[in-house]
Amino acid sequence: MSSLLNFYRKVLNVPLSLLVKSRAIPTDPVKELNLNLEQPIIYVLPYTSQTDLLILQKNCLALNLPDPLQNNELNGQSLPRYVFLDEGRRFFKSKGAKSETESIFYRYLDLHRNNESLDVQLIPASVLWGRSPGKESEPHLRLMSSFQRIISMIWFGRDNFVRFSQALSLKYMVAEHGADEGIAQKLARVAKIHFAKQRYSAMGPRLPDRQAMFNKIIQSPAIKAAIEEEAKTKKISIEKARQEAEKIVNEIAADVSHESLRIADRVLSWLWNKLYQGINVQNGDRVRKLALEGHEIVYVPCHRSHMDYLLLSYLLYHQGLVPPHIAAGINLNFFPAGPIFRSWGAFFIRRTFKGNRLYSTIFREYLAELFYRGYSVEYFIEGGRSRTGRLLEPKTGMMSMTLQALQRGLTRPISIVPVYIGYEHVLEVDTYAKELRGAEKEKENAGLVLRVIKKLKNLGQCYVNFAEPIQVNNYLNQHFPEWKESQAEDSRPKWLNEAVDSVAHQVMININKAAAINAKNLIGSVLLASRQRALAREQLIEQVDSYLQLFKNVSYSDDVIVPNDSAEEMLNHVLTLPRSGVISEKDSFGEMIRLDRESAVLMTYYRNNIQHLFVLPSLVASIILHHESVSKDLIIKTVNRIYPFLKAELFLHFEENDVRNQVEAILTEFSAQRIVKYESDVLQINRARVRALQLHAAGVREILQRYYISLSILLEHPEISRAALEKESRSIAQRLSILHGINAPEFFDKALFSTFSASLKAQGYFDSEGNCILEKAKEAEEILRSLISVEVQLTIQGAMEKVEEVENTETVVKTAEAVTEKNE
C-alpha cells in the first residue's frame, strides 16, 4: 500500500504544481511562532486529504520546516510527522482513522515520560481552498463529486492558503495533564475545535440574504418609531416614509461578493507590485489571535490616503482573516467605483446627518446588525484623510455606536484594533498641499481616479502595523464599571460620552505607539531641521545615525518599527525615489544633500508622521542648547511644564509620572553619543558636536513658537475669549511663517491652536469665568521665551502691536460710523 500511495502522490503532484499557487500564513512561521527546529515537529491536519498534505509539504520545504512526509526518529521509534484528525472521503486508509491518530498522539506523549530533554511541537496546519463562507440560504454541507473537486482545484488553485497555528508543547501537556490515552483523546478533540474556530476566523459568517436583512432592519422598533416621526414631521404618509427608509438602507448597505474579492486580490496584487517596492506588515498575529478567540473585531486605522481602504482589506485577506465591512464616505459612491467598493465590503456614510433622525437611526441599526451577525468592521476615526500627516482629533460618532452595540447586549467581546499606515509616498500629497494653501477640495470622480492612475509608479515602501488592541469589555470594566447597568431603551447612559472620548483617545495613542520610521520620513525630518534645508552628506548621515541609535536605545514603544538599514543605505534609497525632492549636489568641498524648495512643504507631511517619536528628545535638546549649562532637575521641571501640551497635541503615551524616567534615558543617550557633557547631574553643550544638538533641538522649535504666540496674547489680553485667542494666534503665526520662512502648513492650522487652548483650560490656566490666571500663564511664558530666539520673539511682539493697531483703527471707524448714523 505504501508504494501505491507514493505513486499516487507523485501523480497528484503534477496537476498541483501546475494549478496551485499556495501562500503560507504566517509568512515566517519559525520566527513568528517561535518554533524550535532542534526539537521534533508533528503536523496536524483537520481531515484526510493527500492533496492538502502535498501542499503542506511544498510549503514546509519552502519555509525550511521539516518535511511532513519524513518520519521522526525518536528513541528507536519511527513515528509519522503528520496526522489527520478525521477520515473524510479518501481512497487509501493507511492514514487518518481517528483511532490511529489518537494512538500516534499517545505514542508521542509516552516518549516524554522518561526523556526530560524531549519537547515535541504539535503544529495545527490547515489548507484553505477559497474563502467564501457561502450564503445563509445555502445548505451547510455540500458533498462534491470528483469532477467538482477538479473544477475547485482549477478555480481556487490561486486562492490557496496554508495556515500554521501556534505550536503546542507536548512536554508541557505531559507535565500538566499526564500521558495516558485519555489525554491523547482530549488532544484530538481540542485540535478539532481549534480547526473549526480557525476556519470561521478565515471565512467569517455566512453572507446574508440582502433583502431579508433589509426587512429585519426596517422592522426594528427604533426604525419603526423613526419612520412614524418622519411621517409626522414632514406630513407624509407612513408608506412614503417607509420607502424613504428603504432607500436610505440601500444607500448605506454593503453588498459583499467573494468572487469580486477574489478578482480584487488579483488586481491589487498587480497594483502593489507596480506601486511599491515592498509592503511591510507587523503584528498580524495579534489580530489572528483575537479572531481565533471569537472576538468581534473593529479595525480603526489612521487615514493617510484613499489607498488605505484597499491596502488594509488586501493585507487582512493575506493574513488569513476576513476582510472587514468598511465605513466609507458617501463621496466615494460614484460610478463605477461605488458598486465595486460595495462588493468589496464598503458601506457608505454621509458626511453629516445631524438633525436627520431617520438616517442616524437606520445607520446605527445597520452597524448593530453587522456586529450581531459577527462581521468585522473598519472605520476611520479621524473622519477624513489627514492633510498634514499628523493624527487629527478623533470624530467619535462611530465609536459611540460601537459602544452602544456592546451595551445593548452583544454576546461576543469587542476588540478595537488601531492600525498605523505609513507610506514613503502618498498619492494625494500634492492635492493636500494645494488644499492647505486654500484651494477647494476636488470632488472624487472617475476623471480624478484616472489622473491618479497616471502617477502610478515606484512609490517606495509601505508600512502597516497592527497596534495594541483595546478589548472594550475589559476597558469599560476597568474604567467605567457602571456600563453593565441596565438602561431604558431610549435613554443615553451617563457614562457613554466620557467612555467614548476615553476609548477614542486611547485609539489615537496606540496608533502613534505603532509608528513606522522609514528612510523618507527620517531623512526628511533631518533636512527640515536645517534652516537652509541642506546638509553636507557626512553631517546628514551622522545625524540620521544619531536618530537611529536614539530610537533603538531609548524606545518610544515596543511597537515602533525602526529600520535595520544603515543611514548610508537609507540615504541612497531616498535619492532613488522619484519626486522625493531630495537632491545630491557636489562642489569643491564635497557632496551636499538638500531639499528643493517646492518639496520642502510636501516633506513636512512625512516628517509629521513621526514627529511624536522625537519631540521629547527635541525638547530636551532645546533646553540644553538655550541654557548651555543646566541641571538635570531644571530640565525635568521644564519638560514637565510643557509636556501636557505636547501630550494633548501629539497623542503621546507617557503618563506624566513616567516622563522623568524617559528624560533621564534621553540624557544618558545624548551623553553616550557625546552630543552633551553629563557630569554631576549637570548637562553642558559639547562644542565639538553642537551642530548635532541644534538639529535635534529643531524638531520642537515650531511647536514652542506656536505655544509662545498664544501665551503672549493671553498675557496681553487676559479676558480674551478662547475663540478670539485662537483666531489672533493663527494670524500672528501666518505672519511669522512668512517672515521666518517656516514651510510647515500646520504651523497656522486652526485645529492646533484649538487643541492648545483646550489644553490651557484643562491644565487650569483659566478661572471659572474663563479669564486667564496671569501668574500661571506668566511662568509658562517665561519658560517658553527662554527656548525661543530673540528674532522670533521680536517678530511676535511686532505682529501683536500691528494687530492692536488694526483693532484700534477698526474701533475708531465703528465709533465714527455710529456717531454719523446718530446725527443723521
UniProtKB/Swiss-Prot annotation:
One GO BP: CDP-diacylglycerol biosynthetic process
Membrane topology: Peripheral membrane protein
Top-tier EC class: transferase
Pfam short name (any one): Acyltransferase
InterPro entries on file: GPAT/DHAPAT (IPR022284), GPAT/DHAPAT_C (IPR045520), GPAT/DHAPAT_LPLAT (IPR041728), GPAT_PlsB (IPR028354), Plipid/glycerol_acylTrfase (IPR002123)
Catalytic activities: sn-glycerol 3-phosphate + an acyl-CoA = a 1-acyl-sn-glycero-3-phosphate + CoA
Key word Zinc-finger present: no
Signal peptide range: none
Associated pathway: Phospholipid metabolism; CDP-diacylglycerol biosynthesis; CDP-diacylglycerol from sn-glycerol 3-phosphate: step 1/3
SUPFAM superfamilies: Glycerol-3-phosphate (1)-acyltransferase
UniProt key word Acyltransferase: yes
The entry's keywords: Acyltransferase, Cell inner membrane, Cell membrane, Lipid biosynthesis, Lipid metabolism, Membrane, Phospholipid biosynthesis, Phospholipid metabolism, Transferase
GO cellular component: plasma membrane
Molecular function via GO: glycerol-3-phosphate O-acyltransferase activity
EC id: 2.3.1.15
Motif (HXXXXD motif): 302-307
Compartmental location: Cell inner membrane
Taxonomy, superkingdom: Bacteria
Recorded domain comment: The HXXXXD motif is essential for acyltransferase activity and may constitute the binding site for the phosphate moiety of the glycerol-3-phosphate.
NCBIfam families: plsB, PRK04974.1
Family note: Belongs to the GPAT/DAPAT family.
Protein known as: Glycerol-3-phosphate acyltransferase
